[in-house]
Swiss-Prot record:
InterPro entries: ATP-cone_dom, NrdR-like_N, RNR_NrdR-like. This is Transcriptional repressor NrdR. One of its GO terms (biological process) is negative regulation of DNA-templated transcription. A zinc finger (unnamed) spans 3-34. Negatively regulates transcription of bacterial ribonucleotide reductase nrd genes and operons by binding to NrdR-boxes. Keywords: ATP-binding, DNA-binding, Metal-binding, Nucleotide-binding, Repressor, Transcription, Transcription regulation, Zinc, Zinc-finger. Belongs to the NrdR family. One of its GO terms (molecular function) is DNA binding. Its cofactor is Zn(2+).
């Protein structure tokens, strides 16, 4: 590897350790010519996960976009940001585990709603109202009845 200080094409690894849940390797390197030390990161290049929208257009999966939607749904709710970040990572992990490079936006939305319902029901209803485009109060009432029904079934 080329030294960023003197451009010499020879370095040695001084230290190497896994980071980011063993998804990356952090390496401390030292130039064999000038002794300059610097850090590099090595990680697996993942194929992009493409979301196929309802109208057929395609866009790369965006953790940030999903997180923004979750943050908006959880506004003024007692849900910590790190929980939402972990939720987004687990959703992406599950989508990648399916093995397809393309996923339908409906599948992403349903997965988000399923996970969010287990964290905060109010945030779930907020998210569902935007995602499913609730037209009137009756749709909200039906969704809340479904939540109550699920709670009743879980208790028995």
């Amino acid at each position: 590897m080329r030294c960023p200080s003197c451009q010499f094409n020879g370095t040695r690894v001084v230290d190497s350790r896994p980071v980011d849940d063993n998804k990356e390797i952090r390496r401390r390197r030292e130039c064999e010519s000038c002794g300059f030390r610097f850090t590099t990161f090595e990680k697996i290049e993942e194929t992009p996960l493409v979301v196929v929208k309802k109208e057929g257009s395609r866009e790369e999966f965006s953790r940030e976009k999903v997180l923004r939607g979750l943050i908006r749904a959880c506004e003024k709710r007692p849900v910590a940001l790190d929980i939402l970040e972990q939720l987004v990572l687990s959703i992406e992990k599950d989508l990648r585990r399916i093995g397809n490079s393309e996923v339908r936006s409906e599948d992403v939305g349903e997965l988000v709603m399923d996970r969010l319902a287990k964290i905060d029901e109010v945030a779930y209803v907020r998210f569902a109202s935007v995602y499913r485009q609730f037209k009137d109060i009756n749709v909200f009432i039906e969704e809340i009845k479904d939540i109550i029904q699920r709670q009743t079934e879980q208790k028995s």
